[in-house]
Amino acid sequence: MADLLDYGHAIGDEVLKEIAMRLERAIRKEDTIARLGGDEFAVVMESLKEAEGTMHCVQRLNAAFKEPVIVGDAQFVLSASIGISLYPQNGTDAHTLLRNADTAMFKAKEAGRGTFQFYVEEMTRYAVERARMEADLREAVERGELE
């Protein structure tokens, strides 16, 4: 196994291309995949009628990471943290759905490698409270109120 950061951009790009191809094979013909930047991908899956269908899709996406990615002599073992937002429960426009999926993804990352989270409204409240607390702490440090 290797740390991807030790190999530079060219190898990182090859790993991302391989992951993109695996994800493309994991989704249905009517689904859409896009790289958002860095190592983040978005998958738009239309016409999922029930949670069971969503779970089946998540399992297929996670399976894309089961086998190591081999580039040259290096082998990379990767995992995915998946955030899920559902239309119309979690938003009615692309911006809101993507933001909420991103929030859920960060919760999945906190839970550990290879996990997923459905978006729930409490996640946004938690994120807002945390950002407010961090801002308050920064201000306290700047004013010399903490030792």
Give the positions of each predicted feature:
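Conserved long alpha-helical elements within nucleotide-processing catalytic cores of c-di-GMP signaling
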Residues: M1-R28, A34-V43, K49-Q59, R99-D102, ...
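Short catalytic/binding micro-motifs of nucleotide second-messenger systems
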Residues: R25-E30, N62-Q75
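ATP/adenylate-binding site constellation spanning eukaryotic-like Ser/Thr protein kinases
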Residues: G38, S81, R113
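Catalytic strand-loop-helix junctions within cyclic-nucleotide turnover domains
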Residues: V44-T54, G72-Q75, A80-L97, E122-Y126
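Catalytic-core segments of nucleotide cyclases and related cyclic-nucleotide turnover enzymes
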Residues: Q59, G72, Y87-R113
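Conserved beta3-strand ATP-binding lysine motif
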Residues: Y119
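Active-site core of bacterial EAL-family cyclic-dinucleotide phosphodiesterase domains
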Residues: E129-E147
